[in-house]
């Protein structure tokens, strides 16, 4: 409908476009490692998220270039955070911010890089750096993404970014960020239905421009609107439910999926620990392939070095839960249980221990 500025996709057209989308995505690192996750490969990787502020003691403040360098170096040393995401660095003018933050990330970590594009004015420079960093590699160390404007609107900026990053095999994450009761229906099922349509439409655009491009289904950036405070909640049970359900929706289309875990906690307190623990556990158990939000607080507005370390430890515990209990002859400790009772009296010295 050209007059209304609206595009309709039939089910046959949609299925035809999405048939080319890979079930798995490879996140390369400049260290040489690659993390492959998706509908077939399974697995979960975790990144921080875009933030406006740094939590500094009992205060928050605008992020500086030095702050971001410290955050990036910390991420580089954490075992359970597999990539770094750009943030809003106050030292840089908006026209060069995207390029400058990508340069800082590349200087301070060898892990996967996810620049956050805030202006098309810097895309050409970002793409030149991307070509240098990804030269000769099948598993790009850089990926991109953009969010739909709910309800059901892909902006000119989003469409240009999808187009200008096409043709290189770079992973692209298509984000729906429904706000239940605000920009999407107040019911969880209604919000999910809208987010599902938004995400699939984005992936269809990506596949039309570059068939076979690795695309991530991300209806897991969902929020609920607190009707008393007008705050977009990121750590509520309803948000966790929508994110875990979105993983099931992605698997129906054999697509890798993503989500975001955050907390309404303003600092590294018990509320943040509870909400981050619940979120990271549920999202991982639901099979979400890429979880954003490591270190984030205040409904995703802020990030904390201390919370990053705490979340890394939570992620280690979650991964241990995922591995479960190994049951075989060795782990059943047959040689210990069936040994002479006298030998069982000193298990610390036993070879099995």
Please provide the spans of the model-predicted regions.
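Catalytic-core signal marking the mid-to-C-terminal active-site face
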Residues: 1, 306-353
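Short, structured secondary-structure boundary patches
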Residues: 3-29, 136-138, 189-199, 237-239, ...
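Catalytic alpha/beta active-site cores
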Residues: 4-176, 180-185, 189
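Helix N-terminus capping/helix-initiation residues
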Residues: 10, 64, 119, 187, ...
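Generic secondary-structure signature for well-ordered alpha-helical cores
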Residues: 19, 23, 73-80, 107-114, ...
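Short, charged low-complexity intrinsically disordered segments located at boundaries
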Residues: 43-47, 98-106, 133-137, 159, ...
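Amphipathic, soluble alpha/beta structural segments
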Residues: 68-96, 195-197, 295-297, 336-352
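Glycine-rich anion/phosphate-binding loop at the beta-strand->alpha-helix junction
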Residues: 146-311
């Amino acid at each position: 409908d050209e007059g209304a500025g609206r595009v309709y996709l039939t089910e046959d057209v949609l299925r035809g476009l999405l048939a080319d989308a890979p079930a798995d995505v490879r996140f390369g690192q400049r260290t040489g490692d690659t993390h492959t996750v998706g509908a077939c490969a399974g697995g979960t990787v975790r990144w921080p998220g875009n933030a406006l502020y740094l939590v500094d003691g009992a205060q928050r403040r605008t992020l500086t270039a030095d702050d971001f360098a410290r955050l990036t170096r910390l991420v580089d040393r954490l075992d359970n955070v597999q990539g770094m995401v750009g943030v809003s660095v106050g030292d840089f003018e908006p026209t060069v911010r995207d390029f400058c933050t990508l340069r800082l990330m590349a200087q301070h970590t060898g892990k996967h890089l996810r620049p956050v594009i805030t202006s098309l004015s810097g895309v050409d420079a970002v793409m030149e750096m991307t070509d240098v960093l990804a030269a000769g590699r099948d598993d790009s160390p850089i990926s991109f993404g953009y969010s739909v404007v709910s309800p059901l609107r892909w902006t000119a900026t989003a469409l240009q970014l999808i187009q200008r990053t096409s043709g290189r095999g770079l992973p692209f994450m298509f984000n729906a960020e429904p706000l239940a009761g605000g920009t999407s229906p107040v019911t969880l099922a209604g919000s999910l239905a809208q987010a599902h349509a938004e995400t699939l439409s984005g992936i269809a655009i990506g596949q039309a421009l570059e068939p076979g491009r690795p695309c991530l289904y991300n209806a897991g950036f969902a929020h609920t609107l607190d009707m008393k405070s007008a705050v977009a909640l990121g750590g509520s049970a309803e948000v966790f439910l929508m994110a875990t359900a979105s993983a099931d929706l992605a698997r129906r289309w054999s697509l890798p999926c993503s989500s975001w875990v955050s907390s309404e906690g303003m600092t590294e307190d018990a509320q943040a620990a509870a909400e981050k623990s619940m979120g990271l556990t549920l999202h991982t158990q639901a099979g979400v392939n890429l979880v954003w939000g490591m270190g984030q607080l205040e409904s995703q507005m802020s990030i904390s070095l201390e919370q990053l370390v705490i979340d890394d430890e939570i992620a280690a515990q979650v991964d241990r839960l995922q591995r479960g209990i190994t049951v075989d002859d060795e782990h059943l400790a047959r040689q210990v249980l069936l040994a002479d009772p006298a030998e069982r009296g000193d298990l610390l010295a036993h070879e099995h221990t």
